[in-house]
From Swiss-Prot:
Signal peptide bounds: 1-29
Keyword set, alphabetical order: Antimicrobial, Disulfide bond, Fungicide, Plant defense, Pyrrolidone carboxylic acid, Secreted, Signal
InterPro entries linked: Defensin_plant, Scorpion_toxin-like, Scorpion_toxin-like_sf
Gene3D superfamilies: Knottin, scorpion toxin-like
Pfam families named in the record: Gamma-thionin
Main location: secreted
Recorded family membership: Belongs to the DEFL family.
Natural source organism: Arabidopsis thaliana
Name by which UniProt lists this protein: Putative defensin-like protein 15
PANTHER family: DEFENSIN-LIKE PROTEIN 1, DEFENSIN-LIKE PROTEIN 14-RELATED
Modified positions (Pyrrolidone carboxylic acid) in chain numbering: 30
A GO-annotated cellular component: extracellular region
Top-rank taxon, per record: Eukaryota
Length: 80
């Protein structure tokens, strides 16, 4: 039993040691602002198509269909 406890303690210490050397990669987040798409017409039902249109036609970083009263609209996310 003592040998088993020693092995478990060694494994735990090794994991703590490896975790201490793990360097977290921090990328400064770029704040994105919402902007209704200027090129989308009608109700937005396909977020992937909205995303592609925002990126390719409007130079946005991202796009998705969001509910904005009274319907779903294509919203582009651009750097603030």
């Amino acid at each position: 039993m003592a040998k088993f406890a020693s092995i478990i303690t060694f494994i735990y210490a090794a994991l703590v040691l490896f975790a201490a050397f793990e360097v977290p990669t921090m990328v400064e987040a770029q704040k994105l602002c919402e902007k209704p798409s200027g090129t989308w017409s009608g109700v937005c039902g396909n977020s992937n198509a909205c995303k592609n249109q925002c990126i390719n036609l409007e130079g946005a970083k991202h796009g998705s269909c969001n509910y904005v009263f009274p319907a779903h609209k294509c919203i582009c996310y651009v750097p603030c």
